[in-house]
A protein has these predicted regions:
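Conserved cytosolic headpiece of P-type ATPases
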Residues: 1-747, 752-755, 768, 812, ...
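Alpha-helical transmembrane segments of multi-pass integral membrane proteins
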Residues: 67-69, 762-777
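Short hydrophobic alpha-helical module
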Residues: 133, 381, 771-783, 817, ...
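Helix-coil boundary and interhelical linker segments in multi-pass alpha-helical membrane proteins
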Residues: 705-714, 780-807
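Generic alpha-helical transmembrane segments
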Residues: 725, 806-824
Length: 898
């Protein structure tokens, strides 16, 4: 290659002019939403909106009561409580997403200050990557990241890993037009920003920088907001609409019913009094608004937030860094996972899968001469090196296939560096596609300085150069062996050697190897092995009713073989289940729509093939998760319901994703699905618990409205039940661990209402029973002077004298303890187990204890604020014991169902 002095490069003035004209070499980051706007976005939740409306109504009524009716300031407790509930819920959601994004930014830091060798004003200098401009002459070599899109001026054995852009791990680059690859995604004489030099070196002229590069264009495309509504959001929208409609209907019924009652009851009275009617109508409207407020589950947003936040933190421990809170639950609704191959299904590390050296017993290098020749041949006839800074997990620098051979030596406790230093290379013949082999003549360190020719390349070509073979393996036997390797999508290399005598010529620059007495040493098969945990993880997803599709830049044969190894591809699959990128692009939208569910593999996929696949699956009603680690994956990651980037993926891919798989393993995706499904069930359990409370409370307000009595539960007591206690309940149910049994179920129907048939029955029946029990207890307390629950059976009912603070304490505690025991039933819902199955439920039990202690403290110390008075110990025992019947009936029902 020409020396760098042949190029003058740009002058300082030309650099500034180019930067002014074409911009800087930095990808413009997506415009960050201001913190205040991100916080306000949390108020777009439909349940939050209902709460805010209810809070405003409640505040107006409180103002009227305080200023118009001269009531105490305690009337403001209810609106304050509602607004506190809103702020707690939105604040927590904002905090946890902010924390996750901070962790993500640390993970996704991009270094634009990496030094790059350029030629400017005739000198070779190093400048930061961000200072590269269009027109710069850049020098690139093995291990370098390409800083910008450029055209090659010179190249020597240049191989580039373009997998981040095209999915192709090894692309040969050349300036010789005759050697251009007609099927290559990008011209063979172009190198692209974000790709990496795997072997060789070259000089190139920069054509585009920053946003104008191919990486920049894909990054910009990934910023288009293709967000879709998540399944959980859809369900909460439906729930909020249901609650709104029911509360409005009840409010209208109360107003109409009470107005009718007024006229019916007042028909015999003397005349019609507008002042009395206005006062009555105002109190009726206040009762109607109270129903609206009571009907809204104040604790639900908090429950959802806590459940999502808890799952976010726990999922991080299992290799899932969740950036967007909704993605936790959406993973549970996933019906299709579109995954790439390299690095997710496989280890992204070329490895010697099988060695076939006849002279090696058990294919282990020994102390014999053949072993020494094999080891030296691999070490010296190679362009790759190893980074041994981590001796346990060395990494390859250079060609991954050649690096796999050095790793094999390393695993056999042979140091390739010692072998290289012990020999002297005399002549080299680089690898060329037309020859399909490379060769080197060395003064051997293992044969006391004798000249030895080593040849490595395509086994069938290397074997044809040989006069004999170790072990007398025939050509037919070799071909049969190679066919078996090819069926397994493995790359193969053959090895040969010859000890040269005197001045015997072994290599000719034009004709290649000219030696006539080569001995074939053997063959190795190299592959990127499947991760050990992937087959089981894929089987788990398939058992869970989740379809898995492979989208890769590899050949159809390689993709199908990987599919076979992980249990995704079998003999029963036909051509309809596999397609190449160009074929997929040629299909019409109607043809893709018809075929997309049957597809298992898209091979030779291009950047937008995966995005089109995702969009079509979504049109068919599928909930789609997509994995990707390359810049080319960003549009699909952004489009999918859940985008899953890999921890060692590009910054562009991670920026477009919702979850980053920090350990790069497909099995982590299976765990995310399990968490998502369990999370949805936990939210269902809380809704079951919360709505039972609300149904009972609504019935109480309704009964009071038509019977002309006040609610037996004060505003502050209802705040404890609906806000504080429900928040603790949300924490308790959110802390329930994920259940592996959910992976045996099929994905839930995203259109199925979050309150299923069983929940509806339990809410209405349980809420109705609680109401009747409470109504009966209130009736007894109103019509008798209850001083101790031990005397309840001997009480005489009278005409009614109102409720004392002691009786209010009994009623309040009675209602709370009914909900307390019902939480056990809610926890057992969907488990098929007893409510006493407490495995991994320490947090649940602790929070229940906090609720019980809190109730005791409020009744004992709450005084006038809560309209309560301390209860004797025997009354506590009676209340706790009597209300526990809720749990025992639930246990009997579960036992009967079993």
């Amino acid at each position: 290659m020409s020396k760098s002095k042949h190029y003058n490069g740009l002058s300082a003035r030309e650099v500034e002019e180019s930067r002014a004209r074409h911009g800087v070499n930095v990808l413009t980051p997506p415009e960050k939403t201001p913190l205040w706007k991100r916080f306000l976005e949390k108020f777009e939740d439909p349940i939050i909106i209902i709460l805010l409306i209810a809070g405003v109504f409640s505040l107006l009524i409180s103002c009227y009561e305080f200023f118009g009716l001269d009531k105490e300031a305690t009337v403001f407790f209810e609106p304050i409580g509602i607004f506190v509930a809103v702020l707690l819920s939105t604040g927590l959601a904002f905090y946890f997403e902010l924390k996750a994004n901070q962790e993500f930014e640390i993970l996704n830091q991009v270094n634009d200050e990496e030094p790059v060798r350029v030629i400017r004003e005739g000198n070779t200098v190093e400048v930061p990557k961000c200072d590269i401009v269009v027109g710069d002459i850049v020098m690139i070599g093995t291990g370098d990241d390409i800083p910008a899109d450029a055209e090659l001026l010179e190249s020597v054995q240049l191989t580039v890993d373009e997998s981040t852009l095209t999915g192709e791990p090894l692309c040969a680059k050349t300036t010789v037009e005759a050697d251009f690859d007609a099927e290559a995604t990008f011209p063979s004489n172009h190198v692209l920003r974000g790709t990496k030099v795997m072997a060789g070196h070259g000089i190139c002229r920069v054509l585009a920088v920053g946003d104008a590069t191919e990486s920049g264009k894909v990054f910009e495309a990934a910023q288009i907001d293709d967000s879709v509504k998540t399944p959980l959001n859809e369900q909460l929208d439906r729930l909020s609409n249901l609650i709104t409609n029911i509360s409005y209907v009840l409010a209208v019924l109360i107003i109409v019913g009470r107005v009718v009652m007024y006229f019916v009851s007042g028909s015999e009275s003397v005349g019609f009094q507008w002042v009395d009617f206005a006062s009555y109508l105002l109190s009726t409207i206040m009762i109607a608004v109270t129903v609206i407020v009571v009907a809204v589950p104040e604790g639900l947003p908090m429950a959802v937030t806590l459940s999502l936040a808890y799952s976010m933190r726990r999922m991080f421990r299992t290799g899932n860094l969740v950036r967007k809170m909704h993605a936790c639950e959406t993973m549970g609704a996933t019906t299709v996972i579109c995954t790439d191959k390299t690095g997710t299904l496989t280890q992204n590390r070329m490895t010697v899968a099988e060695a076939a050296f006849p002279s090696l017993p058990d294919q282990q290098l020994g102390a014999n001469e053949e072993s020494e020749l094999i080891a030296e041949g691999i070490a010296v006839n190679s362009t790759a090196t190893l980074d041994l800074s981590d001796a346990v997990h060395p990494s390859v620098l250079g060609n991954p296939t050649e690096g796999a051979l050095l790793l094999w030596l390393h695993s056999q406790s042979r140091d390739y560096r010692t072998l290289r230093e012990g020999s002297k290379t005399l002549v080299e013949l680089p690898f060329a596609t037309e020859r399909k082999y490379m060769a080197a003549v060395v003064e051997s360190g293992v044969l006391d300085g004798r000249r030895v020719l080593y040849v490595k390349g395509a086994p069938e070509i290397v074997r044809s150069l040989c006069a004999k073979a170790v072990g007398d393996e025939s050509v037919e036997m070799l071909n049969e062996r190679l066919l078996g390797y090819q069926r397994q999508a493995m790359r193969t290399l053959g090895f040969a050697y010859q000890v040269l005598e005197g001045d015997e010529q072994a290599i000719d620059d034009e004709r290649g190897v000219v030696a006539k007495d080569l001995t074939y040493l053997g063959t190795v098969a190299i592959s990127d092995p499947v991760r050990p945990d992937v087959p089981e993880a894929v089987d788990e997803c398939l058992s869970a009713g989740i379809d898995v599709k492979i989208v890769t830049g590899d050949t159809s044969a390689t993709a199908a073989e990987i599919g076979r190894q992980i249990g995704l591809w079998g003999e029963h699959h036909d051509d309809r289940a596999i397609i190449t990128g160009p074929e997929f692009e040629a299909l019409s939208d109607e043809e893709v729509y018809d075929r997309v569910n049957d597809l298992k593999i898209i091979a030779r996929a291009r950047p937008l093939d995966k995005k089109r696949l995702v969009e079509t699956l979504q049109k068919r009603g599928q909930v789609v998760a997509v994995t990707g680690d390359g810049t080319n994956d960003a549009p699909a990651l952004k489009t999918a319901h859940v985008g899953l980037s890999m921890g060692d993926g590009t910054s562009v891919a991670k920026e477009a994703s919702d979850i980053t798989i920090t350990d790069n393993s497909f099995s982590s995706i299976g765990r995310a699905v399990m968490w998502g499904r369990s999370l949805y069930q936990n939210i269902q359990r809380f809704i079951l618990f919360q709505m039972t409370v609300n149904v009972a409370a609504c019935f109480i307000v309704l009964a009071g409205a038509f019977m002309g009595t006040d609610s037996p539960l004060t505003v502050t007591q209802m705040l404890w039940v609906n806000l504080i206690m429900d928040t603790f309940a949300a924490m308790a149910l959110a802390s329930l661990p994920p259940a592996e049994r959910v992976m045996h179920d099929k994905p839930r129907d995203r259109n199925a209402f979050i309150i299923d048939g069983g929940m509806k029955r339990m809410i209405l029946v349980t809420g109705g029973i609680f109401f009747l029990l409470l109504l009966g207890f209130v009736y007894v307390c109103e019509h008798a002077d209850v001083t101790s629950l031990t005397d309840l059976c001997d009480l005489q009912l009278g005409t009614g004298a109102g409720l004392s603070d002691l009786e209010k304490s009994y009623i309040f505690t009675f209602f709370v303890m009914l909900q307390f025991w019902n939480m056990f039933n809610a926890r057992a819902y969907l488990t098929g187990q007893s409510a006493f199955h407490f495995k991994q439920c320490k947090s649940f039990l602790f929070i229940l204890l906090v609720i019980l202690v809190g109730q005791i403290l409020i009744v004992t110390l709450g005084g006038q604020m809560f309209s309560v008075t301390p209860l004797p110990l025997q009354d506590w025992a009676i209340l706790i014991g009597c209300t526990s019947v809720v749990l025992w009936i639930g246990e009997l029902i579960r036992l009967f169902r079993k």
